[in-house]
């Protein structure tokens, strides 16, 4: 750090003369104000003085800032007169009234000039037109006036910047002269400080090296002694941990075997019940099909017998009617009108009741057969529906049991995988701790600044490991019990 500061001071001391020469050369150039005014006059000819500009100067200032209504009547008259004079001079007319000359307008009353202009129609027309056009002139010349105001503001800023530049140049001259005077003294002082600092650093470095070598020799001797003690303790602890892990492993294997056998028995039992339910379902479906087939055969037989019986009765009735008709026709032809009148009522009274009785009996038989067939079909459909519902419930129950068995087996597999992973993690943790416990003892002694015996450290590690193993085994045992209770 001191070396960096020293280098900066040396570089600044070398650059000071060059900077001073550059500043002196720049001071000989033209000032910014003169250059700015020359540039503006070349690029903006509006800033150059003219007759119309001088005539409208005071009028436009009030008109643009406040409005045409705030312009005084006398100022309007003076402005119109000045514009008329500018128009006369620009057209080459020199014999306009002497009362209206520019040099006399500021010190005399404008009434005499207006009266003089009134004497000639041409003069009065020019004055009247300019007076009436003053509002339009205010609006038309607003942009040049604003430009002029902006340029004036720019020139004011340029003047201020030029003054600021001159102040900076004067300050820089005084600062550079003071810097050149004090530079050598500061460099000598920094050189002395740097030399003393380097000497102090060299002495401190030598002392620290000697202290570190002595401390390292002590730590090496203590490390050899503790490492020898640690190897003996580590062998004993390793044997104890291996025995504990062997016991835990054998216990877990036995537990897994018992759980596996119980789950296999439960699975076989559920499988048998499922097979039995499927067999019952199959036999029930076979019975229903046979019963349905028998019912359909009975219905076909019943309708066939009914049709045959109806056909026979219709044939008998038809034959009887034909015979009766033949006999009647024969009697009609034999006995003529008298016989006809006596026989027809007799036949009518005898045959109509017989025909009506036979028809009524046929209709009643058909209605009874329809009612009996409908009730029988309803009973058969209800029986089939009840048996199908029972069969569906048995099937759902069997599927639920199979899903429960599958879920229990999946949980058991996850539990076994988690247990094995936990054992592997504990073994890796023990190996890691046992390999690095010497370094941990050294770090603890450095932080606590106190000697810790190897026996005390190994006892603490044994307690922590036993607690971790016990908590893991306890959690696995509780998970196994919960799974058995749930099952």
Swiss-Prot record:
GO biological process entries: karyogamy involved in conjugation with cellular fusion; nuclear membrane fusion involved in karyogamy
InterPro entries in alphabetical order: Nuclear_fusion_Kar5
Key word Transmembrane helix present: yes
Glycosylation sites: 156, 229, 272, 379
Keyword Lipid metabolism on entry: no
Localization (cell): Endoplasmic reticulum membrane; Nucleus membrane
Side Lumenal, residues: 16-450
Cleavable signal peptide: 1-15
Cytoplasmic compartment spans: 472-487
Gene Ontology cellular-component terms listed: endoplasmic reticulum membrane; nuclear membrane
Keywords recorded for this protein, A-Z: Endoplasmic reticulum, Glycoprotein, Karyogamy, Membrane, Nucleus, Signal, Transmembrane, Transmembrane helix
Superkingdom of the organism of origin: Eukaryota
Transmembrane segments: 451-471
Topology in the lipid bilayer: Single-pass membrane protein
Family: Belongs to the KAR5 family.
Function according to Swiss-Prot or TrEMBL: Required for nuclear membrane fusion during karyogamy.
Protein name: Nuclear fusion protein KAR5
Organism: Kluyveromyces lactis (strain ATCC 8585 / CBS 2359 / DSM 70799 / NBRC 1267 / NRRL Y-1140 / WM37)
Organismal lineage: Eukaryota, Fungi, Dikarya, Ascomycota, Saccharomycotina
